[in-house]
Amino acid sequence: MNESGRTRRQFLKAVGATAAALTIPPAYAARGANALVIDPQPRYELSPYLYMQFMEPLGTTDGSVAAAWDFGRDCWRPDVIDVTRKLAPSMMRWGGCFSSYYRWKEAVGPRDRRIPMHNMCWGGLDTNQVGTVEFIDFCRQVEAEPLMCVNFESDGRKYWEKDPKGSVRSAGPEEAAAWVRYCNDPDDKLRRSHGIEKPCPMRWWQIGNETSYARNAFNCETAAQKTIAFAKAMRQADPDLTLIGWGDSGWAKQMLEIAGEHLQYIAFHHMFNPDRDRDKSPLRDTEYRKDPARTWEHLMNAHKAQEARIRWMLEQVGDDPTPLALTECHFALPGRNRCEVLSSWAAGVANARLLNVHERHGDRLKIATLADFCGTRWQVNAIMIPVPGGRSFMMPVARVMSLYRHHSGEQAVTVQRTPDGLDVTASRTGDRLYLHVVNTNRQRSVSTQLAIDGMALAAGRVFELAGDPEHEIIHAQPNGVTLSEKALPSDGRWTFPAASVSAVELDVPTA
């Protein structure tokens, strides 16, 4: 799939006999300093859910869900749907801190009977005009698997058990089980009384959101025992659920020892500042504009923090085979509008390196994201929604996630050799190889010779995102970073522009 809409057959016809007969020298003939060599043997399955997005009503802090909803027509804004289809998230998660005081029944049924709620974390009142049914409808329209985060007894946070006016906001296993029935039980009376005859299938559920982050809340053992109670109640409503438990802050080992038989995934989050231990970071506030070269250097090293975080989680789970679910993740930098540097293309290139880290750990990491989904202000958003008018557009992180999502294989393969300056991962589906290539040089292109161990190539094409790393994607100029599609030359040589992110598709003979 690609944005030009051309099929593989049309492409091959367009490039003609030259591409069809394309033969790239075998790997042994391309061992120079500029060689990019791939071992095509499959290593492990790559999950499609490495491209998840995360939707949370953020109240007065950021427009998010309220900005994406058309209150006049009681539907999602068409421009939000359109741009999300281009982003093509494989999974969409509803929840976050909001889940700790969310009572789902207030947001279903007739609109004039829905009960507004105090958004205690993010400020203001949420109208609850967007609830379970609307969220599932959004997921259907953009072809994303829905994931719901339950109210896990307010995650043990006393300050969220009641709102300032005394309304009880905590909910237990029975309410979670009723939610499962509302979604999945063909005979659920409440849903049918709302005029919805057929189920709204919801197979993925997370129990606990950042439960370990609060002081004077649940400890790990208490959370694990409550996780079991929730899991049993929810599975009594539907035995075919996929459940994710909370395991961050050193909880993973104990959580899995106590509750692991009830869980399919263990979750953690990573909202991070790679320069948090450094004074005078160029990534804070608007400092990034003063010294672009220094900013670039810091952004290109940010992947190390992501690598360390995932490795730490793998150490926590040890030999337990339960896969990891990174259900929230993004840069968290101080400054106006939350991480302003993230509007720059330089940050897009940095996020591509983080995606490559995810793929390298794809044997254990099976769910991941790199952004909040949508909003009007925060630069950590994947989709920016102009208000009061204008068309929604993809931020740099979304452009990279979209590129990878549309050009990725099902199985990881090994990158044997790369030229200096390139960060490369590779995958495969059948007779097609996919390379994700990041040029980490700010001002220098990198020329390379592509080769595959023991194979020739039938055809190749390159999908390339490139632009000035200092360019900032804002509502007035959302198209400053362009996506181009090009045929790979018959000699297999290619030059990756400075500060570029590319997806390379290589067709290999099956015989």
Where do the protein language model's features map onto the residues?
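N-terminal catalytic cores of secreted or lumenal carbohydrate-active enzymes
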Residues: 32-264, 268-280
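N-terminal export signals
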Residues: 4, 10-29
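Tight coil/turn sites that cap or link beta-strands
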Residues: 497-501
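Acidic, Ser/Thr/Pro-rich beta/coil linker or hinge segments at domain junctions
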Residues: 455-496
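Noncatalytic carbohydrate-binding groove/subsite architecture in carbohydrate-active enzymes
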Residues: 220-352
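Carbohydrate-binding surface patches
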Residues: 421-456, 462, 502-505
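Active-site flanking residues adjacent to catalytic metal/cofactor-binding acidic residues
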Residues: 209, 327, 438
